[in-house]
Amino acid sequence: MKIIREAVAGTLESSDVMVRIAPLNPPEIDLQIHSSVDKQFGDAIRYSVLALLEQYRVTGVQLIIDDKGALDCVLQARLETALLRASDEKILPWRAH
């Protein structure tokens, strides 16, 4: 998936996450995480974001994650929404869990 424009998904409300995305030169990934629960879950947030980027074959992206204690499913949904808004893709491929 190619990122071609800036996009935002989510809010800064409690238990939510704001994902800001912008294109960079491939194959660079610039991931910045700001989280109220970074000490406890920072590694898990980083792993979840990078795994989703790998799944959708995303490179050349700057991601700024402002987490306010969101569950992983919320983080993934916000990231998928931002990816769609920042690319020319119309739908994401469904996956079995």
From Swiss-Prot:
InterPro entries: CitD (IPR006495), Mal_deCO2ase/Cit_lyase_ACP (IPR023439)
Disulfide bond sites: none
Spans through the membrane: none
Localization (cell): Cytoplasm
Positions where O-(phosphoribosyl dephospho-coenzyme A)serine occurs in the chain: S14
One GO term describing the cellular component: cytoplasm
Superkingdom of the organism of origin: Bacteria
Keywords linked to the UniProt accession: Cytoplasm, Phosphoprotein
Function: Covalent carrier of the coenzyme of citrate lyase.
NCBIfam families in the cross-refs: citD (TIGR01608), PRK13253.1 (NF009726)
Cited HAMAP family: CitD
Oligomer and partners: Oligomer with a subunit composition of (alpha,beta,gamma)6.
Family in the record: Belongs to the CitD family.
Protein name: Citrate lyase acyl carrier protein
This protein's encoding gene: citD
